[in-house]
Amino acid sequence: MKAILFASIVLLCFSSTVIGGEHLTIATEIVQKAKSECASFEGGKFNTTEQTITLHDFTGDGRPEEIVDASQFSCSTSASMWGGSGGTFLWVLVDGKTHEFLAHKWRVVDVDGQKVLLLAVHSSECSDTLGPCYRALVWSDGFRTIR
């Protein structure tokens, strides 16, 4: 009986990891790759914050998608490994796909129940060199963006 109970618990834990962990695995791989890149550059020491991976339900299906924010990375031997004047890398993991962006800042806002990712991007993305430029991104029946 104990063996059956133990097997059931292991199976339940494993199934939740597989079902709910698909994006987590991708997010973790992104962070691990960054850690490896840091270490390979003059033996750098890699650090992240608790805000490195955040959860947001962009598709409205009740299952949160993940954002991996490289502005939360630091490497002791490089100040600009994951960004520069164009912004810092931001990865959004939706439906098994990784969307990569550069952004100076970002925020998720709710517009009538729809989660919208706002990115403050380099002004050249708005075809000029003056003032702020923003992108609004939504994932509803696919991926859409506007600048």
Label the predicted regions.
Residues F46-T54:
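Signature of short aromatic-glycine-proline-rich micro-motifs recurring in repeat-based ectodomains
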Residues F58-S71, D112-A120:
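Acidic/hydrophobic-patterned starts of short beta strands in beta-sheet-rich repeat architectures
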Residues Q72-G83, C126:
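Short, conserved, GDST-rich strand-edge loop motifs in beta-rich repeat architectures
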Residues E50, G86-T88, A103, T129-Y134:
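Short, surface-exposed coil-to-beta transition loops
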Residues C13-S16:
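N-terminal signal peptide c-region/cleavage motif recognized by signal peptidases
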